[in-house]
Amino acid sequence: MPVVRLSQAFVPTLKEAPADAQVASHKLLVRAGFIRQLGAGIYDYLPLAKRTLAKIEAIVREEMDAIGGQEFYLPALHPAEIWKESGRWEVMGDNMFRLKDRKNGDYCLGMTHEEIFTAIARDELRSYRQLPQVWYQIQTKFRDEPRPKSGLLRVRQFTMKDAYSFDVDRAGLDKSYEDQRRAYERIFTRCGLDFVAVQAHSGAMGGSESSEFMVRTDAGEDLVAACPRCRYAANTETATSRLASEQDGAGLPKPEKFATPGVVTIEALEQPPYGVAARRQLKTLVYVADEKLVVAVVRGDQELNEAKLQTATGAQVIRPAHPEEIPSLMGARAGSLGAVGFSRAKVFVDPSLADRKDMVTGANEDGFHLRGVEVRRDVLTGPHATVAELRTVRAGEGCPRCDGTLDVFKALEVGHIFKLGTKYSESMKATVLDADGKAVPIVMGSYGIGVERIMAAAIELHHDELGIRWPPAIAPFQATVLTLGPEPELKKAADELVKALSDAGLEVLHDDREERAGVKFKDADLVGIPLRISVGKKGLAEGKVEWKLRGDKAVELVPLAEVARRAAEHVRAGR
């Protein structure tokens, strides 16, 4: 194996992290000389990062090929027409980088490649006999992220492995999806990640089912609800829970209006003279779903989950209504809104409210509320009212599958798999002839992995106050040899040891710089190569060198003649 000499290598380590770096992976990747920032959400990957990313990509390729994947490399520049076929040209909104060529043609930089792969399938696949197919690529993607931050965790240019399965029916899709799920588990395990697969929201991708692969870390921006008893786990965008039952009063024969001047918040209605607990209030919110106003109702002490509302509405895009949009629909401003007897728009009510009585809500008249509201009688009888999961689950609520209690924690998404079904094949007219000679839409799946996110997630999980502690399979080198002095005999012994390690098949970084031992030790800990072997004057006098594993405090003296064999065995054991 080739040897890299640190005296000749480009590894620009730093003593301090950038002032704007907040998460460990960002701080350490910059300090250890792996990345540099070019612009907001745009990073240079330096030689050490390129080595680690190449190892991650190799693992991904091995596991994709093992399930019959065939690798492609498709353009990052896409004509607008193909995105318009699927309807996503408008859906992607400002997240998509768009540009025009010199002939004023519309193009975009690809965020993902469902449309492109579907077009190939449409043009080339004719019969069910050609299915199943599993196609993938490892390629650069672009997203006009509004708030790039956290180093490689939220960027505008990134590398993704995106795979696509093509089957003749749902049973085939189920098998392809399961193959991908198992492959993802192997990939993340080999990369040293502690992960959990969770139920997820499909979002703009669409489809009937999706799962995310999450790494538990405070650097994550997603929230996962999980039950330690039965292993239930879901992104809070889809998670459900059991709530403790509420004891409502007898209520009133019909809602009764009462004056609440100046009361426009849940908290204000809790105060005297009203004293209405938040759990007895109906929170009524107005949203715009695909340019149509809709109403969502959750309990006063609960939070609306926008992803769940998007699922309930079936909309491609949702947003909170602007204050000026609300009065024309509701007859009042925010703070006095309610859905009693409301029929001017679709109304979605969280199931935890369906059987509640004696509730309080806005009267759709500024300065007034209604008491004695019975949700099923007064809200759900509306012509456009329906029950739908809307609220965000919280830690301590009951598990929906067993009598356990949910934990809610931050997590980082490193992979996402989708059952797309016929969403793209129908809109783009990608069909094959089935066994009966009938044209049927191809049934598709989509499967993504963030390559740089694996690298960053590994650091979030494996680091200490000294630096990175790379999982062996994705470390930039397997061993580093430190020459601890200028003496010719030390240099000669180190050179011979490095050659022996290389001949034994190890990837070695040789720190042969004219630097103090303390500097070399600090850089070795910072860069995080799993095995450190130090050639010093004292040990060499006894025919030995120092052997230390990154993360272990113990330093062992090992006979020089045994080091190469022992190191090779150590690497083969995956340590």
Curated annotation (Swiss-Prot):
Single GO MF annotation: ATP binding
Q: Which UniProt keywords apply?
A: Aminoacyl-tRNA synthetase, ATP-binding, Cytoplasm, Ligase, Nucleotide-binding, Protein biosynthesis
Keyword flag Protein biosynthesis: yes
The answer to whether UniProt assigns keyword Heme to this entry is no
Q: Where does this protein reside within or beyond the cell?
A: Cytoplasm
Q: What is its main location?
A: cytoplasm
E.C. no: 6.1.1.15
Q: Provide the catalytic activity annotation.
A: tRNA(Pro) + L-proline + ATP = L-prolyl-tRNA(Pro) + AMP + diphosphate
Enzyme class name: ligase
Family matches, as InterPro entries:
aa-tRNA-synt_IIb (IPR002314), aa-tRNA-synth_II (IPR006195), aa-tRNA-synth_II/BPL/LPL (IPR045864), Anticodon-bd (IPR004154), Anticodon-bd_dom_sf (IPR036621), Pro-tRNA-ligase_IIa (IPR002316), Pro-tRNA-synth_IIa_bac-type (IPR004500), Pro-tRNA-Synthase_IIa_type1 (IPR023717)
Q: What does this protein do?
A: Catalyzes the attachment of proline to tRNA(Pro) in a two-step reaction: proline is first activated by ATP to form Pro-AMP and then transferred to the acceptor end of tRNA(Pro). As ProRS can inadvertently accommodate and process non-cognate amino acids such as alanine and cysteine, to avoid such errors it has two additional distinct editing activities against alanine. One activity is designated as 'pretransfer' editing and involves the tRNA(Pro)-independent hydrolysis of activated Ala-AMP.
Family from the record: Belongs to the class-II aminoacyl-tRNA synthetase family. ProS type 1 subfamily.
What note about domains is in the entry? Consists of three domains: the N-terminal catalytic domain, the editing domain and the C-terminal anticodon-binding domain.
Q: How does it assemble?
A: Homodimer.
Protein name (record): Proline--tRNA ligase
- What organism does this protein naturally occur in? Anaeromyxobacter sp. (strain Fw109-5)
The root-end lineage is: Bacteria, Pseudomonadati, Myxococcota, Myxococcia, Myxococcales
